[in-house]
Amino acid sequence: MVELGQINRPEAESFSGKRKLYCVASIFSVADAPADYTALVDRYWDEVSRQLEKLESAGKIKKVFSEIIMEQGDESLDILGKINERVPQLIKKKLEEGGVLVPLESADFLGPYTDWSNCLRVVYTREVFQKVFGFYNEVAEKRLGHILDVIEKNLSEAEAGLLILKDEDRVKLQFPKDIEVFLITPPSYDDIMRWLRERMMKKNEKD
């Protein structure tokens, strides 16, 4: 697994002929988010775009995989845009440069996964939480298995792909050994994580 700093031409040549997957953490803001957090998220996606351009010296992106996307076309991108408006912009740019959008999700798993995830947010009793978490965990594992299968079957030899997925999901994926994984972690990523930790600490202090 490669942490992106800066890959120069000799290093890029060492990845020639290998399957490559450029992984970007899906980070988004919400309508009522504080201005400083929204600014951090915007800076994050700007930096991601610049780092991807540098990284593509190791291989131009030919396949694009993104969470939420269940089918090709503008409709799926519009749905994704309601959650994270910066991701469709990045995807469209890569499609214009010759990439192909590959549906990553299955309605059989994404729907139940979302429902059980929402249920976990409103459960109060330990007994019910354990039951709901069991259902959630079961469908979450099936969803991740499907995601891994889609990438394995659609990323061809010597191709480079872009994966946009929450970090907590990505770390659970066991990619085949012949896929070289690159993690895109611009400076603003750490700033966002720090912002979220401080926010949580302040909330806990109030509680």
Feature map (PLM): residue ranges:
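Compositional signal for N-terminal targeting/processing segments
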Residues: M1-D207
